């Protein structure tokens, strides 16, 4: 069976690709450029990941999405929230992570990306779209949830002739479990970029960096990306 993967080069999308590649033929990977701060870094690292797996890589620009997004993931005039391990703990007030999610939200981003990728999947007669949706982020990002996957599958049953489906191999996993699984399948995590910023090295303070750091700490392993960068 064949699949197309949505690849941002983040921990989750790289792990999902690595897992899917064990049982599916990955036809291509799509990276979206919607003006995000880390866009060029994501494109660079996604290209490296695709070279590792020997798969086709395309980049789709969504300038119009950048134009209507006012939150800090795209708008350089807004500050990206900085969080700590305590802020993302289950005992912490939910309002902290909810505010962080709101600050980096991009209007209907996953819906737009999945529908574009669905067109490619149908045109190439691919069965699946592989995504990095996971259990840890589903609480604050509803478009990472199983309910959303099922809703998209239902929509694709109407909008694609071959019934493209969304495959989310991490849907029940937290970040710690994702790191363990990624290491197990030898995912090229040295070229996975999670940071909301696009500097030479990860900031270490945005929510994505903090969740990644906690996951590696919990597994007792060093982050291959930081090792490669000498951080």
From Swiss-Prot:
Enzyme class label: ligase
Positions contributing to ATP binding: 7-17
Record InterPro entries: QueC, Rossmann-like_a/b/a_fold
Pathways per UniProt: Purine metabolism; 7-cyano-7-deazaguanine biosynthesis
SUPFAM superfamilies in UniProt: Adenine nucleotide alpha hydrolases-like
GO-annotated molecular function: ATP binding; ligase activity, forming carbon-nitrogen bonds; zinc ion binding
Pfam families: QueC
Catalytic activity reported: 7-carboxy-7-deazaguanine + NH4(+) + ATP = 7-cyano-7-deazaguanine + ADP + phosphate + H2O + H(+)
Keywords (A to Z) from UniProt: ATP-binding, Ligase, Metal-binding, Nucleotide-binding, Zinc
Known cofactor(s): Zn(2+)
Entry's EC annotation: 6.3.4.20
Binding residue positions for Zn(2+): 195, 203, 206, 209
Cofactor note: Binds 1 zinc ion per subunit.
PANTHER family (UniProt xref): 7-CYANO-7-DEAZAGUANINE SYNTHASE
Recorded family membership: Belongs to the QueC family.
Its job: Catalyzes the ATP-dependent conversion of 7-carboxy-7-deazaguanine (CDG) to 7-cyano-7-deazaguanine (preQ(0)).
UniProt protein name: 7-cyano-7-deazaguanine synthase
Naturally occurring in which organism (per UniProt): Methanosarcina acetivorans (strain ATCC 35395 / DSM 2834 / JCM 12185 / C2A)
Gene designation per UniProt: queC
């Amino acid at each position: 069976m064949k699949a197309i993967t949505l690849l941002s080069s983040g921990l989750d999308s790289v792990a999902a690709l690595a897992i899917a590649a064990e049982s599916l033929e990955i036809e291509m990977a799509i990276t979206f450029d919607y003006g995000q701060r880390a866009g060029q870094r994501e494109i660079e690292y996604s290209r490296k990941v695709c070279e590792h797996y020997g798969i086709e890589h395309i980049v789709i620009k969504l300038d119009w999405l950048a134009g209507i997004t006012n939150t800090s993931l795209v708008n350089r005039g807004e500050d990206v929230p900085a969080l700590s391990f305590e802020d993302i703990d289950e005992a912490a007030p939910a309002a902290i992570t909810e505010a962080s999610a709101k600050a980096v939200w991009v209007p209907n981003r996953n819906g737009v990306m999945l529908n574009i990728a669905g067109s490619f999947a149908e045109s190439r007669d691919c069965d699946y779209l592989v995504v990095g949706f996971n259990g840890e982020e589903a609480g604050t990002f509803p478009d990472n949830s199983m309910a959303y996957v099922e809703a998209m599958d239902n929509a694709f049953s109407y909008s694609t002739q071959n019934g493209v489906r969304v495959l989310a191999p991490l849907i029940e996993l937290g970040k710690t479990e994702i790191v363990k699984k990624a290491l197990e399948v030898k995912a090229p995590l040295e070229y996975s970029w999670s940071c909301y910023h696009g500097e030479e090295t990860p900031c270490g303070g945005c929510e994505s960096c903090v969740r990644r750091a906690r996951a590696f700490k919990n597994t007792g392993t060093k982050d291959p990306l930081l090792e490669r960068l000498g951080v």
